[in-house]
Amino acid sequence: MSERNQRKVYQGRVVSDKMDKTITVVVETYKKHSLYGKRVRYSKKLKAHDENNQAKIGDIVKVMETRPLSATKRFRLVEVVEEAVII
């Protein structure tokens, strides 16, 4: 069980929940440009397994690296950090 602490954990925003038991999460990271020093924003789209379909579009979630669950799914939902505000 202590082995799971070594897996990568990312925090991002849910941009799609149209698939059954799968969510798409955008993770934004910042990296300093090597020559100019400006911080550049990079984003990655990850597909994550959501067993109970609890995450909705706009939620801030934590996802953890896991074994391959399908051709594109390599992460699973750990927790919903902040729910989206419905207007």
Curated annotation (Swiss-Prot):
Pfam families: Ribosomal_S17
GO term, biological process aspect, one: translation
One GO cellular component term noted in the UniProt record for this chain: cytosolic small ribosomal subunit
SUPFAM superfamilies: Nucleic acid-binding proteins
Highest taxon of source: Bacteria
HAMAP family attached to this UniProt entry: Ribosomal_uS17_B
Function: One of the primary rRNA binding proteins, it binds specifically to the 5'-end of 16S ribosomal RNA.
Family per similarity comment: Belongs to the universal ribosomal protein uS17 family.
Name the record gives this protein: Small ribosomal subunit protein uS17
Species for this entry: Bacillus pumilus (strain SAFR-032)
